[in-house]
Amino acid sequence: MASDNAAEQSRQDQFSGTKEVAESHRFDEARLEAYMQAHVEGFKGPLTVEQFKGGQSNPTYQLITPSRKYVLRRKPPGKLLPSAHAVDREYKVITALHNVGFAAPRTYCLCEDDSVIGTAFYIMDMVVGRVLWEPLLPGQNPATRWKIYDSLNATMAHLHSIDHVKAGLGDFGKPGNYFARQVSRWTKQYVASETQTITEMNKLMEWLPANIPSDDTVSVVHGDYRLDNTVLHPTEPKVIAVLDWELSTLGHPLGDFTYSCMQWVMPGQGTGGGTGSIATADLKALGIPTLEQYIAMYCERTNRSGIDNLDFYFAYNFFRLAGILQGIAGRVRDGTASSEHAKAMSENVRPLAEEAWKYALRAGAGS
């Protein structure tokens, strides 16, 4: 167990905190400071800029002034896939959800003028709290682990219960046909970024669109909801902010929820490019809910009797994650990946595709 704890802690160290801004992600800080002086209410310099270690897709920076801290997220420089790195969408959904009382940071401004720092960006509050990267929550006691998972569950149920039209997000995505559109999107991204032939991906591109469940519920979905995309209270076991809304849209809540369940079925540490794995852990001893308990908690909060078609949802989510990581593999190939850990993540595309096909077979593929 000691070696497992060491690996968990090294991952926490690897992704947590800030570093000097990477050479390829530097910009004119004086120009940014002048922009903030004009557009950020209450801003007073001087400004110091650091880069967060996490944030594989959109480079993320901590902006420090004598009186407060801010966070800046930007599109990465270089050639980008269409529809990827949509910081304008992130800004819109975070702003709207914060305004209706959801756990999202306060935003200050969106800048789509590339002349300021080279790419579009937005600025939001730095939420003071804890970002934990290890889903087994080393260093916490069983009762605290349970409360953290319960808060993760409650926060997602809250998100899916928000009236997106009243929140001003009625035009945030196309309502209906979510899975068909998502499979099409990630198929296109996979093909555009393809670096090797993976038979299972080709099979999934045919099977998934033909086997979508008929239920077409719509809500705001986060798209990448997991422990390390949340900020916990500094001392209490509860979520106070949800981060990284790049993949958010109007979609199916069960697609979103079952993605957050993938760490229970992920085969081995690290395969998921950030989702982690608790599949082989002694959850009862740790105080972490089982998959069945976590599903039951969500269903009770959202007035569902259960989740049908679970194997389809896992097949879809493994396929989707493979498509996301293939996009990172393409950026590694093109030299635009924004994290030193991106190359290692991109090597997990094939195992994810194999897992997706395993769940497709369980759902009836090939029969």
Locations of regions flagged by a protein language model:
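ATP-binding pocket architecture of kinase catalytic cores
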Residues: P46-V220, H233-P237
